[in-house]
Every structure is written in C-alpha cells, then in structure tokens.
Regions:
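Membrane-interface motif at the C-terminal end of an N-terminal transmembrane signal
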Residues: 15-33
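Short, hydrophobic/aromatic-rich segments at coil-to-beta transitions
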Residues: 69-76, 98-105, 172-180, 201-203, ...
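N-terminal leader/targeting segments and the immediate start of mature chains
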Residues: 28-74
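Flexible, processing/modification-adjacent segments and terminal tails
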Residues: 128-183, 214-215
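N-terminal mature ectodomain segment of secretory-pathway/periplasmic proteins
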Residues: 56-135
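Hydrophobic alpha-helical topogenic segments used for membrane insertion/localization
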Residues: 3-21
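Gly/Pro-enriched, hydrophobic low-complexity segments
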Residues: 177-262
C-alpha cells in the first residue's frame, strides 16, 4: 500500500508538472525591445527586364513605388515553434547582409520569460548553430540548408530575390516559377507559386536537408498567410514552415522590418 501511495504521489507530481509546463506555454510574452532606429533610404533598384511575367507582376505588387536598394535587413517578431508535439511561444531577430550572411537570435518563452536561446549564423558558406545541447559548425547538410534558408527569408527584402544576379528565375506557368540560386544543388530549386488574384507569393517549396547527416532531402514548404506594408514594401507578416505532410512546426508573426540600419 505504501508503494502504491508513493507511485500515486509521484504520478500526481508528474501530472502537475506537466500541467504547469503546458500552462507556461500559453503565455506569449513580449517581442524583443525595438530600438533599432529607422530604415535608411539608399534609392531604388532597377528591376531586371528578363523576369517571368508572374515574377514581374509580383515585384510591382510588393513595391508599387519601386524596389528599394537593400544592403541589410532586420526582421523582428514573435513565433510559435513546435518540438516533439509541444508548442512554445518565441521571439526572434533575423539580421541579414542581403544575399550573403544571416544571424538568427531566437528565444523560446515559458510564462513569458526566455528559457532557451538559439543562435544561428551563416557566412562564407558555413553555418553555425549554437544550441543548449551543443554546437553544430560546418556540417555539409546544415550548410546547404542554411543557404536555402538565407534565400527563403529574402521574401522579407524582395529586392534581393528579384534583382540579385545569383538568383535565376524560370517561368513554369501563368502563376508559377522556379528559383535557383548559385551554390544550390539543382534538386534544391524553389518552386514558387503566386496567388492568381493578388499576384503575391502563396508558397515556396523545395527539397531541403532536415537534419545533419541526412542522406536524402525532405519536401520543405514556406507558406505565406498574411501580407503587410513595411517601409513601402509589402512583405509577409504571418508565415509558416512545414516538412512534407507534417503540421507546421514554425509560425512567424513579423512586427518590424528595417532596411539598411546602422
């Protein structure tokens, strides 16, 4: 009987801890403090004349007054990130040297407070991930995946997607095109679908390595759910990522987008 009581008590404590843990994930918390200043206007970037029709239309919809020159971009917001079936609120800062490097600062929140921090960096073809369980540096699969992430995130500074000479667009239909960037394997090519009514990107899909050491790539979806204007450019304010037929594991809610900050 004493053993049963101990077992029951242990189970109650575990259940209580699990309930408390779940409750902590229901409090979103605040995004990062915003004190980065304002975007700097560096003029307009000319739109290439050889883009597919759907891509040209997209460019005119997202930047009706012309594409701004973008050297750096800062994207700040909140997120919902799911790991092993448990969804955490999070906040993030993405720093980009447009088309070249990125730095990700992501914090998972519990009861609104940061409990886990992730740092990710990509530069000179090398990805670095600093996680609570260790570091991953210069892994071939992670390097390849990071390059794809770099360009998928350029949807928040579309001047790079549309004008960088390393980005090669090919028309595949009235409302679709492919995007292959220098350095990517051909099978990593993005398929980009545009909404027939708005002309905006509906989703980008590709094959991407999911884990270090993977021998095969997994179908990767980047889906846009909502668009808003920041700095005269229409970019995704809500977007999500999923693998294959899985439920989305990341949902981003963008609060600020800045270009060419000091």
């Amino acid at each position: 009987m004493n053993l049963l009581k101990i077992a029951g008590g242990t189970l109650s404590v575990a259940a209580g801890a699990a309930g408390l843990g779940w409750l902590g994930t229901q409090i979103e918390g605040h995004g990062f403090d915003f004190s980065a200043g304002a975007s700097r206007d560096l003029g307009k970037a000319p739109l290439p004349s050889d883009l597919p029709e759907a891509v040209t239309h997209y460019a005119k919809v997202v930047a009706p007054e012309g594409l701004p020159v973008v050297e750096t971009a800062l994207i700040i917001g909140k997120a919902k990130l799911t790991f092993n079936g448990l969804t955490f609120p999070a906040r993030f800062k993405f720093h980009h040297d447009a088309g070249n490097t990125y730095y990700h600062h992501i914090q998972l929140l519990w009861f609104g407070l940061p409990v886990l921090t992730v740092h990710e960096r990509y530069r000179d073809g090398v990805a670095e991930m600093a996680l609570p369980v260790g570091e991953i540096v210069n892994n071939p699969q992670v390097n390849a995946a990071a390059l794809m992430g770099l360009w998928a995130e350029a949807i928040w500074f579309p001047t790079t997607l549309l004008t960088d000479p390393r980005a090669h667009w090919t028309e595949t239909g009235d409302h679709s095109a492919t995007l292959l960037v220098d350095g990517m394997a051909e099978e990593e090519m993005f398929t980009v679908r545009f909404d027939p009514e708005s002309g905006l990107i509906r989703d980008l899909t590709s094959l991407r390595y999911k884990q270090p050491g993977d021998q095969h790539r997994t179908l990767w979806f980047n889906e846009v759910l909502k668009w808003e204007m920041f700095n005269g450019v229409r970019v995704p304010s809500i977007a999500q990522i999923r693998w294959g037929n899985d439920a989305p594991w990341a949902k981003w809610q963008v609060q600020h987008v800045l270009y060419n900050t000091d």
